[in-house]
Amino acid sequence: MSSSRQALLSLLAHKSFKLGEFKLSSGGRSDYYIDCRTTTLDAKGARLTGEVFAEEIRQRGWKAKAIGGLTLGADPIVAAVSVVTGELNGFLVRKAEKQHGTGQRIEGFHEKGASVVIVDDVCTTGASTIQAIEAAREFGFNMVGAMCLVEREEAKGRPAVEKAAVPASFVSIFTASEVRAEHILQTDDTQPVIFAVAATCEICGNPAVTNVPRNRCAAHRV
């Protein structure tokens, strides 16, 4: 796992993952909630998000001119990747066409026939990702890939998105299990404090107070 990817996972576990009883936008209930926007709209989190998504796109060999997704979850991801790459344009997909002005549903990049990547923050049922895929294709984009930041591994979301994406592929940066495991590591008070050399927190860069399991400052140890 790259350093940017590990740092992004740590930030998601610290800022975005919560245990408890929650009602999801899908209507279901869950014993945990992941609000990715607290990470993707964080100054450092935005940079890491852009780096990790850009790295994944390069590794997949997806040749795209733009990146976009359904508002609101995709918005900060789109902006982050566009800024980090300096070459991928961004577009946003409205949940419905505007009832005024141009009445368009796609905002931003507007080149019909262009190759694009669809992104989302969390995939549960996959409904928002599928809406973006369908809107992008209806507009005239050529979708070469679809991505989400965290896949919840439930509600048959992944198979649904994979089916909608064909012939393109769908990938997730992290699974909810990975984020949960990292969160549990961060909140485990039984972890010992072991230092051989001076270190800084991998999340914020401040002096670390522990390096087990990873370098953390006092604020990010729990």
What are these regions (language model features)?
Residues 62-73, 147-148:
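Short glycine-rich phosphate-binding loop at a beta-alpha junction
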Residues 65, 114, 144:
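Conserved acidic residues
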Residues 53-64, 133, 137-138:
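Phosphate/pyrophosphate-binding loops at sites that engage ATP/ADP/AMP, CoA/4′-phosphopantetheine
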Residues 201-204, 217:
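Short cysteine-rich clusters marking metal-coordination/redox-active sites
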Residues 78-117, 125-131:
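Short, glycine/charge-rich flexible loops or terminal/linker lids adjacent to PRPP-binding catalytic cores
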Residues 1-60:
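Active-site-facing substrate-recognition patch
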Residues 2-11, 134-198:
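PRPP-dependent phosphoribosyltransferase catalytic core
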Residues 211-222:
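Cysteine-rich micro-motifs
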